[in-house]
């Protein structure tokens, strides 16, 4: 049997009574959206003593996951090409002061018969944050481009209104969909060719790359993503935005994310943060780690007499080792 369920249906606390008699394989899509404990809970839902096989799929591995592939705790397979007919999304980084200049681009895109996502990090204005909200942006777009059909999608709308606007956008009845990160996964509109992301400095690399992937899904279409930022921008945020501008491959972006945020706890729950190595650097020394793993495998396959000679040569009388039984 195959069971297909959403993350929330399987992982929340009141689902502890869900168990499988013989769980053999777990396939997790959009793995970056799951926490460490959630993935562990999934694997522990089998009544069998054998650990089920696990296949994780993601366009942008989180730092901890990428580090686990480096330490050989996870086997890695990479699809390093786009689906047939798709072109990379061209990305530009612009100050929020350039908003008016974008209107001309919006009008051209929609005149050519294509559609636009305009993404905001907040639904409503908040005096505590200097950010553009979805509701304010919708008003601004309607004021500056009244001929274009624009609507909202965010989590505070009723399910009926949200679904109607999404369906209308898919059917080409809406030119500009002003939205929040609710459209990060599950939206496939091949006619959408432009993504505007307000206050992009507030979002992480993985999420920005996922959002950018909502456009460029049509065959042989030139698509664009504009990352708008609000000054002042931290050095870390500048590096994130430049990485999105430079790289289109999710694994390249994940490596930058690993360098910027750290690998987290390989044996704990943190999925990012520094590893307290005193000398080694996990990103810089990844090739050395692979070499050491290769040598370790070769040594472990040696005959016991040769292995004992090597251990004695390297360790001598300073260490005591116990031969595995």
Segments from the language model and where they lie:
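Accessory helical-bundle/CTD segments and flexible terminal tails appended to RecA-like ATPase motors
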Residues: 167-176, 183-190, 195-198, 213, ...
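Inter-lobe coupling/hinge segments of SF2-like helicase ATPases
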Residues: 6-9, 13-242, 306
